[in-house]
Amino acid sequence: MSGPELCVGAVAVRDGSILLIRRGTPPGEGLWSVPGGRVQRRETLVEAVRRELREETGLDCEVGDAVGWTELIGRRRHYVVVDFWVTVDSNAKPVAGTDASDAAWVAFQDLGRWDLVDGLLQFLTDHQVISGP
């Protein structure tokens, strides 16, 4: 295993819903998550959030404060993920792009019925993005 890889996530909420993408590539292929991915060389965290959101949903955003961070440690990879609050145009509709096979606004109360990446629901609850399952 190499050293940790730095990643970002974009947490967009509106009207009791959160923006999710269905991952089109590993890790978590086929599962739903917040938009995000690896930070590229010479890229700031804010630049990475904007790029990943645009690539995966076609949406532009304003990046706010960090929601929190988590570590995902597997047999071959170690990811450190910092998630940020983002604001998107309330009338814009997400369209799945690179690394995403689908994109949707999901009501908080429905999250428990979606196939989410491991730990996402707990992260969103722990960081008070949602009040619980």
Spans of model-derived segments:
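Active-site-adjacent beta-strand/loop module that shapes the phosphate/pyrophosphate-binding cleft
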Residues: 70-93, 127
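A short coil-to-beta-strand element that immediately follows conserved catalytic motifs
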Residues: 59-68
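Conserved hydrophobic "DFG−1" position in protein kinase catalytic cores
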Residues: 12, 20, 86-88, 105
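NUDIX/MutT-family hydrolases
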Residues: 85, 95-127
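Conserved beta-strand segments that form the floor/walls of ligand-binding pockets within enzyme
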Residues: 7, 33, 83-85
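Conserved Nudix-box catalytic region and its N-terminal flanking loop in Nudix hydrolases
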Residues: 17-55, 59
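A structural signal for short, well-ordered beta-strand segments
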Residues: 10, 66, 84-86
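Conserved N-terminal beta-strand and adjoining loop/helix that marks the start
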Residues: 1-18, 38, 69
